[in-house]
């Protein structure tokens, strides 16, 4: 029979192992060429999982939602179970042109853009494509909604229409509204920009186009940068370093975020940076459009 001191010693040796075993395994999901890839949080162990674009790994890390391109303008939302490889393609939506799925925090619904009657609208559906509904109609400015994102409580969403930023309930009712020109003093939004709320719901992570020329000659258009928008004040501040082209942000944790960047306008990679950091760290080369599981 083991003595008490020896048993205590062995227990202390086991504690770190047990704690590590209890920690969730988080993953990165990103685009590479015409396919969607999965990797460990540090970028190692990358593997191709499916052909498609606009990857969004579910918060629980069990499934990935994405856009499956077809011929011409045909695009469908699809969901794949990562363990089995089984996938469901949403072919019964009211349009054959839908893209950019975003998971609800509880992993039960998907939000995306869908083309109806010459306008992009926001669609909401279950993870099997059932129970489809529109989120309102056009924006109050009579423009198309862009950049949909879930609020952290799953009861409302954020979007923008190139004129204003909105918080909407799931019927499309406007809960809050901010002018983009007031929120960004030296930048503007485009239809492909991403919104990422903080876990505490007090701020939004944005990418936006700077009102300035950039140093990369091979880059067409204004240089992109990452901003943190404070909901209470309605103002934003740039957090990505000067001269760094940064877009497509997502939260890694409360103090760090991931984003896509390039140094030459031709080759892309996923980088990591803290909110106050100045030197981005490469996580995955030849990658873009990153999302990360929460657990």
Segments the model singles out, each with a brief description of its role:
Residues 21-295:
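Sequence signature of WD/YWTD-type beta-propeller architectures
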Residues 5-17:
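Bacterial N-terminal signal peptides
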């Amino acid at each position: 029979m083991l003595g008490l001191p020896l048993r205590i010693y062995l227990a202390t040796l086991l504690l770190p192992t047990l704690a590590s075993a209890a920690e969730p395994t988080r993953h990165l999901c990103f685009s590479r060429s015409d396919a969607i890839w999965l990797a460990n949080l540090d970028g190692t162990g990358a593997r191709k999982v499916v052909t498609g674009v606009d990857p969004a790994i579910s918060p629980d890390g069990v499934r990935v939602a994405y856009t499956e391109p077809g011929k011409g303008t045909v695009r469908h939302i699809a969901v794949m179970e990562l363990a089995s490889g089984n996938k469901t393609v949403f072919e019964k939506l009211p349009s054959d042109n839908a893209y950019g799925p975003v998971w609800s925090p509880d992993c039960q619904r998907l939000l995306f853009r869908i083309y109806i009657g010459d306008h992009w609208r926001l669609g909401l559906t279950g993870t099997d494509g059932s129970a489809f509904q529109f989120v309102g109609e056009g924006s109050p400015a009579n423009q198309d909604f862009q950049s949909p994102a879930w609020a952290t409580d799953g009861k409302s969403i954020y979007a923008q229409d190139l004129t204003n930023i909105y918080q909407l309930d799931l019927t499309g009712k406007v809960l809050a509204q901010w002018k983009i020109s007031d929120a960004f003093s030296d930048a503007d939004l485009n239809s492909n920009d991403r919104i990422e709320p903080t876990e505490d719901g007090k701020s939004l992570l944005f990418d936006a186009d700077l009102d300035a020329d950039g140093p990369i000659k091979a880059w067409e258009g204004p240089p992109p940068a990452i901003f943190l928008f404070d909901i209470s004040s309605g103002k934003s501040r740039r957090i990505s370093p000067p001269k760094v082209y940064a877009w497509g942000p997502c939260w890694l944790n409360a103090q760090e975020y991931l984003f896509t960047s390039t140094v030459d306008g031709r080759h892309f990679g996923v980088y990591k940076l803290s909110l106050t950091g100045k030197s981005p760290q490469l996580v995955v080369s030849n990658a873009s459009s990153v999302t990360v599981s929460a657990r």
